[in-house]
Amino acid sequence: MRYTSHAVETLIDEFAKLPGIGRKTAQRLTMFILHEEKEKVESLAQALLDLKNKVSYCSLCQNVTDKEIDPCNICTSVKRDKRVVCVVEAPNDVLAFEKTNQYNGLYHVLHGVISPLDGVGPDDLKVKELIHRLSETDPETSIKEVILAINPTVEGETTVLYLSKLLKPLGVKVTRIARGIPIGTELEYIDDATLTRALEGRSEL
């Protein structure tokens, strides 16, 4: 079905471009917004603009942060163990670990995994930034352990293998979360208890 309104059709098309949103869902979202009060729609529009204008990436961990807060709140927290860094694929994975309230170290977000079929190599990820962090020499803040918490996919396994070979010669302990997580499952969809057990049961590579 095509709508007589160009504005309605345009918004449906834009929503349908989002991951996990089909055309029917895009239509429902558009109709919902159409019937919302103007002030609420303007608030949503402003939130979207703020997302692009005010959000950046932490210069240390590469996680999302407000532009005026860099390094991010996690990296600067005095309550965090700065000697342990958990390497994850995406910012959503940081949220998953934070929800468990069991991890007290820092993070490093790669923003992807090695995927030759998609033309994504190590240079396309935040690997150099991770290596730079390992050069810290202060005994109280220098990284002693790197936990590889990459999604258990084929691409994720390739990334883990690459990073473990890259990091071991640097004299840092390299571990990975336990394999109790099903292959092909993304960490952000794992329940807190399972993710906590995977973190606690991590093994050295």
Curated annotation (Swiss-Prot):
Q: A Gene Ontology molecular-function term? A: DNA binding
Q: Where are the transmembrane segments?
A: none
- Write out the GO biological process terms: DNA recombination; DNA repair
* Domain annotation Toprim: ranges: 83-182
Q: Which InterPro entries does the record cross-reference, listed alphabetically?
A: DNA_Rcmb_RecR (IPR000093), Rcmb_RecR (IPR023627), TOPRIM_dom (IPR006171), TOPRIM_RecR (IPR034137)
What are the entry keywords?
A: DNA damage, DNA recombination, DNA repair, Metal-binding, Zinc, Zinc-finger
In residue numbers, the zinc fingers (C4-type) are 58-75
Which Pfam families does the UniProt record give? RecR_C (PF21175), RecR_HhH (PF21176), Toprim_4 (PF13662)
Spell out the PANTHER family in the cross-references. Answer: RECOMBINATION PROTEIN RECR
Q: What does this protein do?
A: May play a role in DNA repair. It seems to be involved in an RecBC-independent recombinational process of DNA repair. It may act with RecF and RecO.
Which HAMAP family does the record match to this protein? RecR (MF_00017)
**What family is reported?**
Belongs to the RecR family.
Provide the protein name.
Answer: Recombination protein RecR
